[in-house]
């Protein structure tokens, strides 16, 4: 076989392996995991000690989850 065919076969074999390895999500380190828990009904939209972007993300996440979990009550 020519070197070009061998190289193409090698790339074709290694590419799926590298793609699947790159897509894996490893365990989250406990120091990086957020331990904030928002009780339903007790959230007033403010998060202490966060920057503007972090607060926006937090509020959007809570609003989205509230929207998801209240859909069954309206149908």
From Swiss-Prot:
InterPro entries: Phytosulfokine. It is found in: Secreted. Sulfation is important for activity and for the binding to a putative membrane receptor. Keywords: Developmental protein, Differentiation, Growth factor, Secreted, Signal, Sulfation. GO terms for cellular component: extracellular region. Residues 23-66, 72-75 form a propeptide. The modification Sulfotyrosine is found at residues 67, 69. Residues 1-22 form the signal peptide. Its main location: secreted. Belongs to the phytosulfokine family. This is Phytosulfokines 3.
């Amino acid at each position: 076989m020519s070197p070009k065919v061998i190289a193409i076969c090698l790339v074709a074999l290694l590419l799926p392996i590298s793609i699947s390895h790159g897509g894996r999500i490893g365990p989250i380190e406990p120091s990086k995991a957020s331990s904030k828990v928002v009780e339903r009904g007790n959230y007033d939209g403010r998060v202490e000690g966060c920057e503007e972007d972090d607060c926006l993300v937090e509020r959007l996440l809570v609003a989205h989850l509230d929207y998801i979990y209240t859909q069954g009550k309206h149908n």
